[in-house]
């Protein structure tokens, strides 16, 4: 049996250009070549994939602070005279003790993303179940002071939060002050609550003068502390530091002491050691999850027990155990003040390859903290914000230890299952096998704002915001992009592949409930490998069979494996994905397919994403009957390649070898295509439409002219426009036009005639004409001031040219001979 400890997790130097930009404080924006692009027509995917980087307040600098954040959790760096530590998000669960019976963190709702620590926050809403969640800690020497800055994920009640920084070494561990309940080596302790700061001697407890000062930046959720050199001067020495965050009890003047059950003022889930801290800094060696290895699990119940035992899903396994022991000595950093003095840049403490957790700033911000009352699974609302409501969101990566390919790494978007989190695949062979294939691909897993978002609304938007963030920090080849997911993530794979089909080369849903039969037709140009279990207790054989029937009805390429026997957890726990890596291979996205089928379902569109009204070289898809789905099927004859025949179902069987379960038998049914036949090349489009009133075809990408022959079959009125062509030329608008009479010629494509024209002025139709060959249009009685002219000219062949321009009306004087004398000859 393989163990994850046997895997190499090499750390390479970060790309020089990215490091240089980071230390200079320049925002690292996505290389345009790292995101999908087309020469004309609609961009693939939703608009949020291409949105600019968000400037979140928590990531901003003010005052003496200038270095950009690391945004790699568990990383340490020296940047431009500052030392930075980046913590993990939502890891503030404290010591591992006895579970609080009223803990709002439900072990059922988060069965596959359990926490290891047991501390619970006081029930006061001001603490938002997240008040002591450390985001970042910084240190910077100033002229006469040493500055520290702590950034928190939530800061609604500054007077209820405290942190302590242990400074210096000692031969024996010292008790942290103010009831923190832990010990570590230290010479001094700096404790801050609200805007009160105290520097104390670790041996005597005496307060040192002059006093440290603390300032609060509520908007950025940052607390800055300055210690005068007269009280403590590190000079150019190397100083040992440790730090922890907890809840402050103002009435008692100390850290709030955990009891068995949380009250409005006291935490619950306490431990016998009395550790009162929720979150420790400098945890650079938190273990990654083991995907249940070496335990064996087939059912959900068996898998849930193993993930609970593992306890690494929020990257706080060591934190929980160490806090429970009361001795936090292992969580420390050696801060070199000589490096800080010479403003050295050193990112060697930041993971570059292997299994990594990152942080990005979302466009969406629904408040602070964690709202456990939000349950997307059972919500009837179309928009669900998820329980992790803040602007900062985490995601997981596997970055292969390979040379960067000339065009960049591929990308595999991997979505977690119901009740799991973004770290579900961290540390897995799946991540490594899919990532290490070929020239290398980065595997990225979103949190999607909670355990049950179903990759709809804001959970779906989180996927694309994550993708955009990956593209900001790594060079990607967007032609090598695949999508996969487990259980709910498998359903999300079907969902995202069918909604945004021109983003993906291949799709790999694992035990995923299928989406609608109609949606499978949108997968025409995406080969799919699907794995299911014969004895799956959640996604049973009937769902597996429905997925296969959907694929067969749609006539797509679909490789359907059913492991026998296998429960809902077997494939993940077995953790062997060699055949999937082979299937994904080096396949590239086909963005300009000759045959496009797409379902337009506005009921799936949400405020979080742009409408799914475009795919491949089709855009402007508008449903005729609002609220009902529409479908379009378009074949371009320009390539001279016809539809390949759908081959008969191929049956086979085998065993999957190499995983933790040993040989796992499977039955396989494969739907594939034969060789594509040659057809006569023609400037022709065959368009079949249901419940769509309009569509725009991008001519260059479809391979046709601006005046192709269009064979249209529709169940109602449908306008087919041809885009990607020169717009209908209109007269210049540099000068005003005569409002009494404005005439312009109708230019059109070569060998075409304008057979119908509609002209709108400020949205009102002024002209509607039909004819054999319309050459010009005249407008009269135009507005005196600015007005907008829109012309829709239909050419022979059915394509439409549309142009819009704004003009300014005026009354021009006409030549006159009145008052002049003429000499006759």
What is each residue range found by the language model?
Residues 282-399, 553-557, 564-729:
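Alpha/beta-hydrolase-fold serine-hydrolase catalytic core, especially in secreted/extracellular enzymes
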Residues 34-77, 169-188, 232-323:
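Acidic/polar low-complexity flexible segments
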Residues 389-392, 401-411:
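Proline/glycine-enriched tight loop/beta-turn segments at coil->beta junctions
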Residues 408-473:
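Active-site machinery of serine-nucleophile hydrolases
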Residues 35-198, 248-255:
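Surface-exposed, glycine/proline- and aromatic-rich loop segments on solvent-exposed faces
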Residues 25-34, 143, 207, 339, ...:
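Polybasic, low-complexity, intrinsically disordered segments
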Residues 401-407, 454-488, 498-504:
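Gly/Ser-rich "nucleophile elbow"/oxyanion-hole loop immediately N-terminal to the catalytic nucleophile
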Residues 529-532, 536:
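Short beta-strand/loop motif that positions the catalytic acidic residue
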């Amino acid at each position: 049996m393989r163990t994850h400890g046997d895997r190499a997790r090499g750390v390479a130097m970060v790309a020089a250009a990215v490091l240089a930009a980071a230390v200079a404080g320049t925002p690292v924006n996505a290389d345009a070549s790292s995101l999908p692009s087309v020469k004309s027509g609609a961009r693939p995917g939703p608009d949020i994939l291409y949105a600019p980087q968000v400037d979140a307040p928590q990531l901003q600098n003010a005052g003496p602070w200038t270095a950009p954040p690391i945004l790699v959790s568990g990383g340490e760096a020296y940047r431009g005279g500052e030392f930075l530590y980046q913590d993990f998000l939502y890891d503030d669960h404290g010591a591992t003790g006895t579970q609080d019976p009223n803990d709002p963190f439900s072990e059922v709702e988060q069965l596959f993303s359990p926490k290891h620590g047991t501390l619970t926050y006081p029930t006061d809403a001001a603490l938002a179940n997240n008040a002591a969640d450390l985001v970042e800690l910084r240190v910077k020497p100033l002229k006469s002071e040493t500055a520290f800055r702590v950034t928190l994920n939530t800061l609604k009640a500054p007077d209820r939060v405290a942190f302590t920084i242990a400074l210096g070494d000692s031969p024996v561990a010292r008790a942290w002050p103010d009831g923190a309940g832990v010990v570590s080596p230290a010479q001094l302790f700096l404790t801050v609550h609200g805007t009160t700061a105290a520097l104390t001697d670790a041996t005597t407890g005496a307060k040192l003068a002059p006093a440290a000062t603390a300032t609060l930046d509520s908007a950025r959720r940052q607390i800055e502390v300055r210690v005068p050199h007269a009280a403590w001067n590190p000079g150019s020495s190397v100083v040992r530091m440790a730090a922890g965050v907890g809840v402050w009890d103002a009435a008692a003047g100390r850290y709030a002491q955990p009891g068995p059950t949380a009250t409005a003022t006291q935490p619950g889930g306490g431990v016998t050691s009395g550790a009162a801290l929720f979150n420790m800094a400098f945890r650079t060696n938190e273990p990654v999850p083991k995907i249940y290895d070496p335990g064996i699990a087939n059912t959900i119940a068996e898998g849930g027990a193993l993930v609970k035992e593992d306890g690494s899903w929020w990257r706080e396994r060591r934190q929980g155990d160490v806090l429970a022991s009361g001795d936090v000595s292992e969580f420390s950093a050696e801060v070199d003040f000589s490096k800080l003095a010479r403003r050295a840049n050193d990112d060697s403490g930041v993971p570059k390859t292997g299994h990594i957790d990152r942080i990005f700033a979302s466009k969406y911000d629904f408040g602070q903290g964690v709202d456990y009352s939000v349950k997307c699974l059972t919500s009837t609302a179309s928009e669900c914000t998820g329980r992790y409501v803040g602007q900062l969101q985490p995601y997981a990566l596997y970055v292969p230890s390979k040379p960067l390919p000339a065009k960049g790494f591929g990308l595999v978007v991997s979505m977690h299952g119901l009740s799991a989190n973004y770290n579900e695949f961290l540390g897995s062979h799946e991540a490594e096998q899919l990532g290490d294939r070929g020239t290398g691909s980065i595997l990225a897993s979103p949190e999607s704002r909670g355990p049950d978002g179903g990759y709809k609304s804001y959970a779906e938007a989180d996927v694309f915001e994550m993708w955009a963030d990956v593209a900001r920090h790594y060079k990607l080849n967007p032609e090598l992009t695949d999508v996969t997911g487990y259980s709910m993530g498998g359903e999300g794979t079907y969902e995202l592949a069918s909604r945004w089909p021109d983003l993906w080369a291949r799709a790999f849903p694992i035990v995923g409930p299928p989406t609608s039969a109609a949606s499978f037709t949108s997968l025409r140009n995406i080969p799919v490998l699907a794995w299911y279990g014969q004895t799956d207790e959640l996604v049973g054989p009937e769902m597996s069979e429905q997925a296969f029937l959907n694929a067969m009805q749609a006539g797509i390429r679909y490789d359907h494996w059913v492991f026998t026997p296998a429960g809902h957890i077997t494939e993940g726990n077995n953790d062997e994905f060699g055949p999937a890596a082979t299937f994904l291979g080096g396949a590239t996205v086909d963005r300009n397919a000759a045959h496009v089928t797409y379902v337009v379902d506005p009921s799936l569109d949400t405020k979080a994403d742009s409408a799914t009204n475009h795919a491949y070289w089709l855009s402007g898809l508008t449903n005729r009957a609002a609220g009902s789905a529409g479908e379009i099927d378009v074949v371009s004859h320009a390539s001279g390649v016809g539809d390949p025949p759908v081959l008969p179902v191929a049956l086979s069987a085998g065993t999957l070898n190499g995983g933790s379960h040993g040989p796992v038998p499977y039955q396989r049914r494969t739907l594939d295509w034969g060789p594509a036949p040659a057809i006569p090349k023609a400037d022709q489009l065959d368009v079949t439409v249901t419940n769509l009133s309009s569509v725009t075809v991008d001519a260059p990408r479809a391979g046709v002219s601006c005046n192709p022959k269009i064979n249209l079959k529709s169940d109602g009125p449908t306008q087919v426009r041809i885009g990607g062509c020169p717009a209908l030329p209109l007269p210049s608008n540099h000068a005003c036009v005569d409002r009494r009479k404005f005439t312009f010629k109708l230019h059109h494509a070569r060998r075409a005639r304008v057979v119908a024209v509609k002209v709108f002025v400020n949205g009102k139709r002024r002209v509607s004409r039909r004819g054999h060959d319309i050459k010009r249009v005249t407008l009269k009685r135009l507005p005196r001031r600015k007005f907008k002219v829109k012309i829709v000219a239909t050419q022979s062949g059915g394509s439409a040219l549309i142009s819009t321009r704004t003009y300014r009306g005026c009354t021009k004087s006409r030549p006159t001979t009145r008052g002049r004398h003429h000499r006759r000859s």
